[in-house]
């Protein structure tokens, strides 16, 4: 499969992840028939699960610069293709954030300053958690996400179950950390909404690149070491 086609798949997949995950948080979480935190967590997991079946055979279904980077560290993805994948993922996330904005702004009383499901810490943490807490959360959650991804897609793992394991892992990660940072573990997912919100969301965006990338490197290296045959 050509790199261009794989980039296209990553763009579409990341678009779906942000549209489904952030879209559910913005449009469906707090309405009278709202789905709440549990629903948002499952929405993120379902986007990955569905796209893993849809495009996993095309691009690997990374949908996340941190995942791509972690797979490079883990020896599962060529470093020369990292930047093209990241570019495609970020574009997909920005397009999805734009669609969410267009829909959400069609309702009276919509305020962009509310965040468009942006990630944040301190005053912009859903639970008021500090920068330090947010950093630890994002590093650890991303590291564990990479362990699950690499383990579930290992040739020695049970065949056909990887999308389910990975989707449920992302759901669990959101259940744990939505109160802390609104859950990133994905720099592209954070970038899309932040570009529309501006202000505080852009000022705090650095954390949601730095921490997930560190966590991904830890997770990729950890699984590579654990899985190495003697």
Swiss-Prot record:
Catalytic activity from the UniProt record: H2O(in) = H2O(out)
Site (Involved in tetramerization or stability of the tetramer): 22
Record Gene3D superfamilies: Glycerol uptake facilitator protein (1.20.1080.10)
Transmembrane intervals: 9-29, 35-55, 83-103, 131-151, 160-180, 194-214
Record motif NPA 1, residues: 64-66
Motif (NPA 2): 186-188
UniProt xrefs under SUPFAM superfamilies: Aquaporin-like
Site entry (Selectivity filter), positions: 44, 174, 183, 189
GO MF annotation terms: water channel activity
Pfam families: MIP (PF00230)
Cellular compartments annotated: Cell inner membrane
Signal peptide limits: none
Main location class: membrane
Function: Channel that permits osmotically driven movement of water in both directions. It is involved in the osmoregulation and in the maintenance of cell turgor during volume expansion in rapidly growing cells. It mediates rapid entry or exit of water in response to abrupt changes in osmolarity.
Domain notes: Aquaporins contain two tandem repeats each containing three membrane-spanning domains and a pore-forming loop with the signature motif Asn-Pro-Ala (NPA).
HAMAP family given in the database record: Aquaporin_Z (MF_01146)
Subunit comment: Homotetramer.
Protein name according to UniProt: Aquaporin Z
Lineage: Bacteria, Pseudomonadati, Pseudomonadota, Gammaproteobacteria, Pseudomonadales
Gene name linked to the record: aqpZ
């Amino acid at each position: 499969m050509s790199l261009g086609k794989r980039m296209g798949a990553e763009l579409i997949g990341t678009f779906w992840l942000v549209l489904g995950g952030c879209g559910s948080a913005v449009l469906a979480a707090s309405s009278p028939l709202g789905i709440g935190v549990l629903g948002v967590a499952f929405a993120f997991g379902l986007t990955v699960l569905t796209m893993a079946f849809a495009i996993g055979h095309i691009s690997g279904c990374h949908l996340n610069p941190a995942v791509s980077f972690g797979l490079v560290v883990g020896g599962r993805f060529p470093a020369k293709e990292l930047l093209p994948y990241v570019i495609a993922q970020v574009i997909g996330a920005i397009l999805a954030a734009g669609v969410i904005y267009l829909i959400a702004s069609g309702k009276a009383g919509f305020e962009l300053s509310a965040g468009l499901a942006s990630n944040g810490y301190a005053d912009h943490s859903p639970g008021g958690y500090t920068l330090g807490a947010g950093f630890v959360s994002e590093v650890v959650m991303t590291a564990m996400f990479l362990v699950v991804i690499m383990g579930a897609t290992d040739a020695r793992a049970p065949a056909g179950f990887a999308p389910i394991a990975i989707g449920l892992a992302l759901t669990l990660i959101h259940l744990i950390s939505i109160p802390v940072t609104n859950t990133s573990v994905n720099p592209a997912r954070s970038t899309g909404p932040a570009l529309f919100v501006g202000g505080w969301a852009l000022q705090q965006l650095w954390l949601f690149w730095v921490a997930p990338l560190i966590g991904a490197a830890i997770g990729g290296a950890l699984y590579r070491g654990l899985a190495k045959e003697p």
